[in-house]
C-alpha cells in the first residue's frame, strides 16, 4: 500500500489514488506499506484516509520518481464553445464533478473568471481545474449537502502545483474510496 511519509504520531496518508486501499489492506493477510516521500500527507476527514505505521506488517522505504504530471493542451474552438454552454447552466453553489481533459479544464477556467460563487467539489478525479477554481476564490464547498467544507475526490492527477496544494492544505480535502465517491445514494444527496 503506498503511503505518505509519517507525521510526528506515526500516521500516514493513503496517497493520491484512493480506489480501495483501506478495504484492501483491512482484508489482507499481510500488509506492506511503501513510504513514498513524494505523496501528499493527506489524512482525510476524521482520519478516513489515515493509517498508522503499526497497521503494517512490513514497511518499505526508498527514493521515488516524481508523481505523474498531467499537462493540458490549449482548448480548441469546440472545447470553448462546449464550455460556454456548460458554464451558462451552472448555478451558484453547484457541486461539480469535472473529468480530465480540454473541456473540463476550459469549463473550470471559465467558471474561475465568472461571477459564480461557492462552488463545491465531489469528483472522481481532482485536477488542476479545481485548483484554478480555488485560486479564484470560487471553490468553497460551503453549500455542499454532504462533506460540507471539503473537496471530496477519489484520485488526484495534475501538476506538481496540484500535489503541493494537496500536501500544504490537507484540511480542505476528503480523499475517499471509490465506493464512497461514486455511490449513487451519496450523489443523490447533492443538488
Describe each model-derived feature in a short phrase.
Residues 1-191:
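Conserved alpha/beta enzyme-core scaffold
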